[in-house]
């Protein structure tokens, strides 16, 4: 199989539950061409957006928000959400760097992990509802289209957040101490500046298409939040691992939706100035 097709296919095996099959050869190709992360995110975003579009026509808002959350994790899996719980335990652990890393890698879930996970899920639900409510006031009958495009941008932003945090991070343990690097370290090692820029430009283009310049704001916001997560990971653990990358995915998605909701609120109140909303 062509190396690009293998990397693209492996992206779905690695970042979703779509049963395309995955092998170490495929993972190696994906890590060499890790700019496929936002490309895979775009395809997943189309699927999630389609469910949002159809669901907005059929279901009441709160029901659709809950169903959308279920579909997001049905199609993307819970691996990245597990990263939130591990990061939460590590952040809440007291003591030395070694104790924090031990809590990070502990397979049991503590209070910090449970709390972080609950807060993330509540914020995801709230951000979807906020886009629905503010979007209904701004776009009226075009709300299903808005929901489609918002969920699309959120998923592209989530995957580019992973690429962003990996591109600027250093692995735990350092490369020179890695006998057999894990998937997190492989992601960091593959996220070169070149691969980051290719993915970033692709993500910016596809997020520009639905809303024009406004579509870039949630995308850029998610990438900036990924760097904040990286900063906190350095402060607590002295580096980055797969849990931090997964956390960037989850928080990046929520960040994009929150920014979209805020922009809709500002638009409703007449504070958007010369910026105009566009719908494909």
UniProtKB/Swiss-Prot annotation:
EC number: 2.7.8.26
Transmembrane segments: 4-24, 39-59, 61-81, 108-128, 196-216, 255-275
InterPro entries attached to this UniProt entry: CobS
GO molecular function: adenosylcobinamide-GDP ribazoletransferase activity; cobalamin 5'-phosphate synthase activity
Superkingdom, taxonomy of origin: Archaea
Membrane topology: Multi-pass membrane protein
Catalytic activity of the protein: alpha-ribazole + adenosylcob(III)inamide-GDP = adenosylcob(III)alamin + GMP + H(+); alpha-ribazole 5'-phosphate + adenosylcob(III)inamide-GDP = adenosylcob(III)alamin 5'-phosphate + GMP + H(+)
Gene Ontology CC annotations of this record: plasma membrane
Keywords of the record: Cell membrane, Cobalamin biosynthesis, Magnesium, Membrane, Transferase, Transmembrane, Transmembrane helix
GO terms of biological process kind: cobalamin biosynthetic process
Cofactor or coenzyme needed: Mg(2+)
Enzyme class: transferase
Pathway info: Cofactor biosynthesis; adenosylcobalamin biosynthesis; adenosylcobalamin from cob(II)yrinate a,c-diamide: step 7/7
Localization, UniProt: Cell membrane
Matches recorded under HAMAP family: CobS
Biological role: Joins adenosylcobinamide-GDP and alpha-ribazole to generate adenosylcobalamin (Ado-cobalamin). Also synthesizes adenosylcobalamin 5'-phosphate from adenosylcobinamide-GDP and alpha-ribazole 5'-phosphate.
Family, similarity comment: Belongs to the CobS family.
PANTHER family registered for this protein in UniProt: ADENOSYLCOBINAMIDE-GDP RIBAZOLETRANSFERASE
Name listed for the protein in its UniProt record: Adenosylcobinamide-GDP ribazoletransferase
Organism: Methanosarcina barkeri (strain Fusaro / DSM 804)
């Amino acid at each position: 199989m062509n190396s690009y097709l293998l990397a693209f296919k492996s992206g779905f095996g690695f970042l979703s539950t779509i049963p395309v099959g995955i092998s170490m050869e495929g993972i190696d190709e994906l890590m060499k061409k890790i700019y496929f992360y936002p490309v895979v995110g775009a395809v997943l975003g189309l699927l999630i957006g389609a469910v949002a579009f159809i669901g907005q026509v059929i279901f009441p808002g709160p029901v659709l928000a809950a169903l959308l959350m279920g579909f997001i994790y049905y199609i993307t899996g819970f691996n990245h959400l597990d990263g939130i719980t591990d990061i939460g335990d590590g952040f809440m652990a007291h003591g030395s760097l070694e104790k924090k890393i031990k809590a990070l890698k502990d397979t049991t879930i503590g209070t910090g992990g449970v709390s972080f996970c609950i807060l993330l899920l509540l914020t995801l639900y709230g951000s979807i509802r906020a886009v629905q409510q503010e979007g209904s006031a701004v776009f009226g009958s075009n709300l299903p289209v808005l929901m489609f495009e918002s969920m699309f941008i959120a998923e592209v932003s989530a995957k580019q957040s992973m690429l962003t945090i990996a591109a600027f991070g250093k692995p735990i343990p350092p490369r020179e101490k890695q006998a057999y690097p894990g998937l997190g370290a492989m992601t960091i090692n593959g996220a070169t500046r070149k691969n980051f820029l290719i993915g970033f430009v692709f993500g910016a283009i596809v997020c520009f298409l639905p809303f024009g310049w406004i579509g870039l704001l949630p995308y850029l916001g998610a990438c900036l939040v990924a760097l904040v997560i990286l900063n906190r990971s350095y402060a607590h653990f002295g580096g980055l691992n797969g849990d931090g990358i997964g956390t960037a995915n989850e928080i990046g998605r929520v960040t994009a939706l929150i920014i979209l909701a805020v922009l809709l609120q500002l638009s409703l109140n007449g504070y958007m100035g010369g910026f105009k909303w566009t719908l494909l």
